[in-house]
Amino acid sequence: MQQINFYRQRVAINVLAKDIANAKAIYEAAEGHAVIGVLSAQFATVEEGVPEVKRWMAEVPSISVGLGAGDPAQYYKAAMIAAHTHPAHVNQTFTGSGFAAGALAATGGEQTHINALVSPTGTPGEVVISTGVSSSQGMPARVSCEAAVRMMQGMGAHAAKFFPMGGEKSLPELYALATTAARHGMTLIEPTGGISLDNFGIILQTCLEAGVPRVMPHVYSSIIDPQTGNTRPEDIIQLMEIVKALV
């Protein structure tokens, strides 16, 4: 069964891989504490995505079905691919998370972790929840972190994904969201956007200090070799050293 293997029950890292060989190398470098993203955006249809995700799942114990740069148009594909494959994790827009939870429940995939994407507003304590296909085109819906977390829980999401963070730019907002999540029994937060080896530590520490039980930062382009397209296993080792120093 697919699952997220959190280091000391606290931290896992969500990363991309060029191919299955790269994914296996990363997973090994992370000592099993990595979740490997497979993006729905690369598939024209759900039917095309399902066998490919199954192929990755057969080789890597922790797969995350992704959208692709938070693209709301991918919400349906991501949810349905996850419902047909039951990966460890699936990424969702805020508005799509309830749909994904229903699709997974209907197919016996309740163990798949679902996140719901909310975005920074510039004001700690408030987030944008209008991250869906239609809602992202209109007037931004700004709500309190408490309202957002309670709504996520009501829709069946397990985690708040905070994107695009812009690295350290949104740290006070991340802290506010993480403390709210912890206070209301949400067990996982996923900071995403502009995270690198340089700022990974402070971002992780911010979440841990907020008291949220589990943290899964998404670290993407900063650890991908531009020449080969591979995520660098040596960078994963460095990230894990930071995790071990903080947890």
Model segments located where?
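Glycine/serine-rich loop-strand microenvironments at binding/catalytic pocket rims
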Residues: 162-192, 245-246
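Conserved N-terminal beta1-alpha1 strand-loop-helix module at the mouth
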Residues: 1-92, 97, 146-154, 169-175, ...
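C-terminal helical cap(s) of enzyme catalytic domains, especially alpha/beta-barrels
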Residues: 56, 79-82, 103-105, 224-247
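Glycine-rich phosphate-binding active-site loops on the catalytic face of alpha/beta enzymes
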Residues: 34-42, 87-98, 120-122, 163-167, ...
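Glycine-rich beta-strand-to-loop/alpha-helix junction loops that act as flexible
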Residues: 67-69, 190-195, 220-221
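Conserved, mostly hydrophobic/aromatic
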Residues: 203
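Conserved anion-binding
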Residues: 68-168, 182-185
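Charged helix-capping and loop-helix junction motifs
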Residues: 141-146, 172-178, 232-236
